[in-house]
Structure formats: structure tokens, C-alpha cells
Amino acid sequence: LGNLCQVALPNREIEFVYQSEILNQYAGMIPQSAAIAIQEALFTGDAERLRDRLEKLLETSVSFYDTAKESFYHGLMLGLLATLDNRYQVLSNRESGSGRYDLCLLPKQEKLPGILIELKAVKNGTKDELKKLASDAVLQIQQRQYDVQLREAGVKKVLHFGVAFSGKHVEIVSEWA
């Protein structure tokens, strides 16, 4: 992930091909019930349910050898969130406030909350260490004011998620802002 770039889909035909050939193929790898549960947990700020679903997905879908770096988890989360493009503009590694957030969901509908996700990864982390990292991630969102972009777009309700990974384990802290 050394070279990041923003890609725009130039027209509806290309967007359709992208949706049908790429996103739907990826989405088929995740049971629909799991994808729906992950989405509902995100929309409601249910950190425990989101943790349970993500951990189950990690246990059943990935190799322990794949999971060493934050960039792996970033790609996994970005892939999961890409299927929400009908409800959200999914943004990754953008500058906002006084820093750069990991993931941002800018709602396309007024009734949906804005969502900011800050990811952390550690090798051989304990449950307590992961919980602390997740709390630190939420604090980072607040201190660096990552929600400025959402607020400027008129988003009134914003959820902050701190997500800490270690191997196939995950801890999540969420907070309404």
C-alpha cells in the first residue's frame, strides 16, 4: 500500500461493471446474514456485536499468517464497507481535522449517521491491550478532530469506532459524537 490513489468511476456503465464483477464477487465470500449484521452493528454503534461478527469472519476466512499488519485489516474493512456504496460514500486515508483518518462513511441519506473508523494492529496483543488500543483510537479521532469533514457536510450524528486487531482477535470501542 505504498502508493495510494483515488479512483473515480467515470460513468454508470463502468460503475455497473465494477459492482457486478468486483464488489459482488467479494460480497459473495461473506454470508449475507453476516454482512447485514456487520452493517446493523455499524449503524447503531453496537461495538460488541460488530466485534463478534468480525472475529467470527476472521476465524473462518483468513489465515493467521495474513494478519500481521494494519494494512491487511484496513483492506479487509474497506472491502466490507465497499458494499455500502448505495448508502455511503466510503472514504479511505483522507485528511480531515489535524490528521488522516483510516476510514470514513459519509452518508448519502440524512437519516444515517456518519461513521469514522480508526484501526490499530499489534502482534500477540492481549485482550486488555486490544481494548486499550481501541480506546486510544477513539481518543485519536476526537483529539485530531477527524469528524470536521462530516460536520462540514452537514452530518449531525457521528459514530466513532476504534478497532484494534491482533491475529484473529479484535476489540472495538464505539462512541457517539
Label the predicted regions.
Residues 1-145, 173-177:
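Extended alpha-helical interface modules used as scaffolds for assembling large macromolecular complexes
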